[in-house]
Amino acid sequence: KIGTEGAYPPWNSKDASGNLIGFEVELAQELCKIMKYECTIVEQDWDGMIPALVMRKFDAIMAGMSITDERKKTITFSQGYADEVASLAVMKGSSLEGMDTPEGINLSLGGSSVKKALKTLTDALAGKTVCTQTGTIHQNFLESGDVGSVNVRTYKTQDEVNLDLTSGRCDVALAAAVAFTDYADKSGKPVVLVGPTFSGGAFGNGVGVGIRQ
């Protein structure tokens, strides 16, 4: 059995009939064919994903899960099968558009340029409500103090984050960049990426299959 969230497009989601679809669902099916296994892909809420794996409700996680040192304390990962960068997103016309930051920040590198970019973000996000999915690397980053003491609002799913961003209940949101671009393309909503992309450090080292230790 393989666990996935079914609520994080384009990685994994559900069609109108409730069937699991997405890049990871297709990848899991192909891997099972190659290994000649009969696999069942099951849906699991994100915040219970790792506990469910540990409790043997399924044998592996394929759910857009980034490989981080913190998660390695509880589970093991395969080699990464995809790169992922995070990004802030706002509605077009936001005052946060045009922030003077580098195109990307790798937190693993550190150095003066990273510190300068984080200071710019800290100033820009002061007093803003930043929305993100609970139990994610994005929540961990926002609550780490790297961008000051921001007002973080968390949600059970990325769909809920997108809804509150477009309805104006969030000033800005943080997630995988592809989650926002996919949503903007499919919904037609004027959601735009702002600031730098984020990788390394708290954001991990790519996306991998989570496996019990």
Regions flagged by a language model, labelled:
Residues 29-43, 124-126, 144-157, 169:
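A local structural motif
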Residues 27-28, 49-52, 58, 138, ...:
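Short, hydrophobic alpha-helical packing/hinge segments within bilobed ligand-binding/sensory domains
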Residues 37, 66-67, 73-130, 135:
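A conserved helix-loop-strand patch within extracytoplasmic ligand-binding domains
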Residues 6, 83-87, 178-181, 185-213:
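Periplasmic-binding protein-like
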Residues 1-65, 73:
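Extracytoplasmic small-molecule ligand-binding "clamshell" domains
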Residues 36-38, 44, 54-63, 128-129, ...:
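Alpha-to-beta junction loops
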Residues 6, 65-66, 92, 134, ...:
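Short secondary-structure boundary segments
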Residues 25, 40-51, 114-117, 152-167:
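Short helix-initiation/N-cap motifs at beta->coil->alpha
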